[in-house]
Every structure is written in C-alpha cells, then in structure tokens.
Amino acid sequence: KNYDTVLYYNKTVEIVYSGELTLDTVTKYFEFKLSSISDNLLLYPRLNDLIITVTDSRVNSSPWRLYATINHDLESDDGIILKDSLVYVNDLGEISVLSSTPTLVYTGESNGGLLKVTNISWNENEGILFQLKDYLENKQEYKAEITWILEE
C-alpha cells in the first residue's frame, strides 16, 4: 500500500438544455365593437388586436396547441350574465362557445430544432369574438377572464 499517492479523477458532466415552449405575451384586455360583422348572427369584432406570442426553443420540437377557457360567462358588476357570448370563430367560420372546457384556438408547427417565435393574431371576423344572444343593459361593462393553455 502506498499512502503517499493521491489519485485524482476528472469527471466531465454535460448539461444539455433541451429548450422550452413558452407563452410570452398576450393582449391583457380587449373590448368589442358593437357593430355586427355577420348578417345572420350578431357577432361583434374586437376593438383592439388580440396578439399572442409563443416561443419554441425545444431541441426536439413537435407541433403544439393553444387552448382558451373562461372562468365564467361575461358578467356585469350588477350580476347581469351574458350566457354563451364569448366565442371562438376559426378560419372556416365555425363557432365554438368558450367555457371552462378548453377550446382549441391555434395549432403551431414544430420548430425543426431551431428557435421559433410565433405571433398569433386573427382577422376581424375570426378569433375571440362577442356573440349577442340576449339584450344588453345600457351603461354596463361585462367582464370575464380568459385562461390560455399551451400544450405540447
């Protein structure tokens, strides 16, 4: 036995960052213009643009999906509820009522292993719109909260 010998070992640890899929920005508030964009349904467009930014830096990327849910129907401070009034309209004109069940609003493509930033926006007659089924009370403001879910 040789007690004077000190053994040194070098160990290399490689940490690989596999990237991430992130929801970076979402328009925080938007309002609706009360002039209908549809003859047969009372659909109203947003006053301001709804823009969502998603960054995909995943090394092994795959298609991803963005869903929207609401915590409750549009409601005024006085408790007046506009049932089934927040809707999502896709590029084919198909209408889905927003609820606590996730509604698919966008499908993103794989990034091919490279950083990809996707800016999501919709035309005036697409995306999140206001559908009037009941009458509106004068001088009332209606609110609901949209939750966005990003899924790989």
What are these regions (language model features)?
Residues 3-89, 109-152:
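N-terminal small/polar-rich segments of proteins
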Residues 85, 94-96:
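Carboxylate/His-rich catalytic cores and anion/metal-binding grooves
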Residues 96-108, 112-115:
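Extended, solvent-exposed, non-transmembrane regions
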